[in-house]
């Protein structure tokens, strides 16, 4: 696959990958809980909270048949340059994108270290088929996306029990939770 920095939309069998960005008027109590988490078009695309995004893939290295990248949001203004990372429970989201993060960095300077590229999560792309090296055919190559521990990214159901009845949503996850493993491919590739 592409061994340089590029920008592309990330798609899977459930459509385009996007981010939750819920307007306050839509869910005043839960919008802050969900904003920044990654989801798919199929499960959230019909809601006002789904925002399709593109990513910048910064190539790091190729080892053991896998390509390693740092991945950041390339769509703005709110999520521009947000880092694709996972929380301690394995949920995937964009980190370091909001002005509030900048304010927190001023108050707690050690959190500035998290912005250093060397400390950002890396993601492994495992191709599921051969690629002929032609950029135009790269959009047809499927791959798994794995976290630093080797877990494949899946779409997993999350329940919010603070409401009655509980809210059911699906987000991207890499870890031990049961879900549908995603087979990704790229769209609208732009090599830098």
Task: Annotate each predicted stretch with a short phrase.
Residues 1-192:
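Lectin-like carbohydrate-binding module/patch detector with strong preference for beta-trefoil
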């Amino acid at each position: 696959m592409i061994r340089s920095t590029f920008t592309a939309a990330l798609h899977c069998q459930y459509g385009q990958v996007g981010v939750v960005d819920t307007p306050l008027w839509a869910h005043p109590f839960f919008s802050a809980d969900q904003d920044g988490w990654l989801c798919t078009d199929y499960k959230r695309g019909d809601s006002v909270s789904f925002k399709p995004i593109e990513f910048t893939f910064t190539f790091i290295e190729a080892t053991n048949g896998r390509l390693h990248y740092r991945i950041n949001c390339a769509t703005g203004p709110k999520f521009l340059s947000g880092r694709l990372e996972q929380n301690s429970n394995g949920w995937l989201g964009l980190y370091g994108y909001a002005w509030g993060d900048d304010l927190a960095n001023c108050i707690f300077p050690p959190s500035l270290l998290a912005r250093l590229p060397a400390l950002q999560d890396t993601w492994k792309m495992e191709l599921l088929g051969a690629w002929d090296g032609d950029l135009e055919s790269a959009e047809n190559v499927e791959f798994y996306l794995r976290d630093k521990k080797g877990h494949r990214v899946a779409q997993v159901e999350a329940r919010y029990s603070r409401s009655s009845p509980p809210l059911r949503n699906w987000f991207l996850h890499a870890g031990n939770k049961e879900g549908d493993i995603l087979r990704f491919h790229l769209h609208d590739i732009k090599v830098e």
